[in-house]
Swiss-Prot record:
The protein, known as: tRNA threonylcarbamoyladenosine biosynthesis protein TsaB
InterPro entries: ATPase_NBD (IPR043129), Gcp-like_dom (IPR000905), T6A_TsaB (IPR022496)
Cell compartments where the protein resides: Cytoplasm
UniProt GO BP: tRNA threonylcarbamoyladenosine modification
Quaternary structure and interacting proteins, as annotated: Homodimer. Forms a hexamer composed of two TsaB, TsaD and TsaE trimers.
Recorded family membership: Belongs to the KAE1 / TsaD family. TsaB subfamily.
Gene3D superfamilies documented for this protein: 3.30.420.200, 3.30.420.40
Gene name for this UniProt entry: tsaB
Keywords of the record: Cytoplasm, tRNA processing
GO CC terms, sorted: cytosol
Length: 206
């Protein structure tokens, strides 16, 4: 099976399986996603003598995360698969972060959304992944309350490390379970609210 999977919600993570061989790339340089991602993907495919049409499924991170980075990842995947209508596996970036954690237990994943607010989700990782709190935007105060409520064993915050191997494995699973989508159905998981909305909700809570 040939699988390409990538996530650009924060840093660039790319995984590629060609048959039984797995290849992983993590880019932490200063170049913008739009500059580096298409180049790296093309180089990886060329070095492995793989054509895009040879791919069985392509996975892409849909967030939560920086919208600009997510759009670059999604646009890159759409450009690759649209001529061949290759199935796309939509990957929740917070779920991929939790699955990349080597330890089991309650996992809290959080990332700064804007000043005073975080994206946040909580999962139970134990021979699988079960959401205890779906991704949402919360204030810094709410994040403290959520941390107290769930008493997570693991807290993954801001610099989120996603394993390219996990991206590939999840893409394969979605392909096997027939949970892939068409390229024109890809949408980023956009959770941001306006500052006015967030401040109004905060005011209502007192």
């Amino acid at each position: 099976m040939n699988v390409l999977a990538l996530d650009t919600s924060q840093r660039i993570r790319i995984g590629l399986r060609k048959g039984e061989d797995l290849f992983e790339i993590s880019y932490t340089g200063e170049k913008k996603h739009a500059e580096i991602l298409p180049v790296v993907v093309k180089k990886l495919l060329d070095e492995l003598d793989l054509k895009v049409k040879d791919l069985d499924v392509v996975g892409v991170g849909i967030g939560p995360g920086g919208l600009t980075g997510l759009r670059v990842g999604i646009a890159t995947v759409v450009g690759l698969v649209s001529p061949y209508d290759i199935p796309v596996a939509p990957l929740n970036s917070f779920e991929m972060t939790a699955k990349s954690c080597p330890a089991d237990g309650v996992v809290l994943v959080a990332r700064r959304a804007r000043k005073g607010y975080h994206y946040c989700a909580v999962y139970l990782k134990d021979k699988g992944l079960n959401p205890l709190k779906e991704p949402s935007v919360v204030s810094d105060e709410e994040l403290e309350e959520i941390t107290k409520e769930f008493s997570p064993k693991i807290v993954l915050k801001d610099d989120l490390l996603i394993s390219p191997a996990v991206l590939v494995e999840e893409s394969e699973r979605l392909f096997r379970e027939k949970k892939t989508i068409h390229y024109y159905e890809i949408e980023p998981l956009y959770l941001q609210k306006s500052i006015a909305e967030l401040n109004w909700e905060k005011k209502k809570r007192g």
